[in-house]
Amino acid sequence: PLYSSAASDVYKRQLLLLIISFGCSPVFAENRAMKDMCNRLFPEHSGNFTFELAPDSLENDFFTIESINDKIKISGNNNNSLATGLNHYLKYYCHTHVSWYATDKIEMPRQLPVLLDKITIFAKCKTRFFLNYCTFGYSMPYWKWKDWERLIDWMALNGVNTPLAITGQEAIWYDVWKEMGLKDQEIRSYFTGPAHLPWHRMSNVDYWQSPLPLSWLKNQRKLQKQIVDRERLLGMTPVLPAFSGHVPAELKRLYPDAAITQMSQWGGYDEKYRSHFIDPMDPLFGKIQKRYLEKQTKLYGTDHIYGIDPFNEVDSPNWDEDFLRTVSDKIFHSIEQVDSLAHWIQMLSLIHI
């Protein structure tokens, strides 16, 4: 479990101070985000729960659960903790399972169990990451908002606070490449079909089952806005993509002096589906990064954490340690030039097929 009831003495003393401070504070306003979640999951019992945000002064996330006046009261230091507390009650007291499938019915007891004593649970770790690039290529390409809404609820219920959020990036890349001189058909043909986009994003394959429809790009852009807004509302920090060096082959025509090379073949795909990479030491790299991140931030906002994997299951143009070190340095510097608070998260699936 991501949360533990074994609080340290320091935590217990801090919690006592918080409880004392609650007695001197005004009544907290109803937590709309959590009420809305209850209405989505089990509307018939929504009125049986109350949620209260506690001062966020402890080192770790925490929640408390208690029965007060025939209601279940859940307190926590943020909405993510409140959601995790709700799931703890559902799982261990109601014996209720909430799946991430929107069509799965949630079976609740007719009478909600009463807690005899108040319980307090502390998170075991601060950052609780979920998803990887490949998961966005199974059924997710065809998900509607209703599907995502349920998954985001599930993530919050299970304590996830750092989800990968890479939907909708092609809409931004479309604008970037078009501004740099590529034609509509070139750009949409450079993308793969929806089911293979994760491997396109990881620089494994281009052009496969393309062109990508403009309508799909627009719908995914709107969907990503809904996704990151809801994730933030529920106390999460979405991990957005940034530029890794993967470029369309056609960019070489417009920028003949750019240090663009072809990546190795991947997964048995024909030569014509190989991807291309621009050296991060080329000045054009930083310009592309800046253009992309500024557009992404304007559209989706930022929490200053970005996912980049430059050589996922493909060969680096050069395996020299100094080259790889310089590539990493230049990639991070290009992000930092746009976002001085940037953090880089990497999956490290650095194996060659």
Model-derived features: positions:
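Bacterial Sec-dependent N-terminal signal peptides
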Residues: 8-30
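Conserved short beta-strand edge segments in small beta-sheet-based binding/regulatory domains
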Residues: 98-99
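Aromatic-lined carbohydrate-binding surfaces of glycoside hydrolases
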Residues: 45, 54-59, 64, 68-80, ...
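Single conserved hydrophobic/aromatic residue that forms the stacking wall/gate
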Residues: 1-11, 351-352
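Long, charged amphipathic helices and adjacent flexible linkers at domain junctions
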Residues: 111-116
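Short N-terminal segments immediately surrounding and downstream of signal-peptide cleavage
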Residues: 28-43
